[in-house]
Regions:
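N-terminal single-pass transmembrane signal-anchor helix
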Residues: 1-34
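Residues at secondary-structure transition points
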Residues: 4, 36-40, 44, 102, ...
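Generic N-terminal initiation segments characterized by hydrophobic and/or small/turn-forming residues
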Residues: 6-9, 43, 79
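Conserved hydrophobic beta-strand within the GNAT/NAT acetyltransferase core sheet
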Residues: 9-12, 53, 111
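Membrane-proximal N-terminal amphipathic helix
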Residues: 35-62
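Periplasmic/extracellular, small/polar-rich flexible segments of pilin-like filament-forming proteins
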Residues: 58-157
Length: 157
């Protein structure tokens, strides 16, 4: 009797089906993990910018004016290299001031999800103001404070 070696078509199809099931479970979990890690990076950049603005405020007593008498703006964020997340490579968040919200007494920074991260429908926008209030939204509208569920969920993860 001849001893055959190899796989039958049925064994191959079962293996492919099992791999398909594993991939269908693993990929969404990975994408969710990657989106959450990019959220963390965006929040860190917002807080870094806020620290720089606050250090400047201690000198000038004016959020809008820098120590060299120039005005703080979205262009300044670009000069600092903090206008996108990450600062090099594929952009996941665009950092800017909300509708030129910066003035002498305050500001609101926003991180808007772009590119691949725009698929993260739960936390499309992060906001941070001069008082350290952390907000998030699924739209470009700044929430009223940080007590809403979206803000609490997005800043916690």
């Amino acid at each position: 009797m001849k001893n055959n070696k190899g796989f039958t078509l049925l064994e191959l199809m079962i293996t492919i089906a099992i791999m398909g099931i594993v991939v269908s479970i693993a990929l969404p979990a990975y994408y969710n993990y990657a989106a959450r890690s990019r959220r963390v990076e965006a929040r860190q950049v917002l807080q870094t910018i806020a620290q720089q603005i606050d250090q400047n405020y201690r000198v000038t007593r004016n959020y809008k004016q820098l120590a060299d008498k120039s005005e703080l703006s979205d262009a300044t964020l670009a000069l600092w290299g903090l206008d996108k997340v990450p600062t090099a490579g594929n952009e996941y968040y665009k950092i800017s001031f909300v509708n030129n919200s910066i003035n002498e007494s305050g500001y609101i920074l926003q991180a808007q999800a772009v590119g691949v991260q725009a698929g993260d429908k739960d936390c499309l926008y992060f906001f941070y103001d001069q008082s350290g209030v952390k907000m998030a939204s699924t739209t470009a509208t700044v929430p009223n404070g940080s007590r809403d569920q979206v803000s609490q969920t997005c800043w916690a993860k």
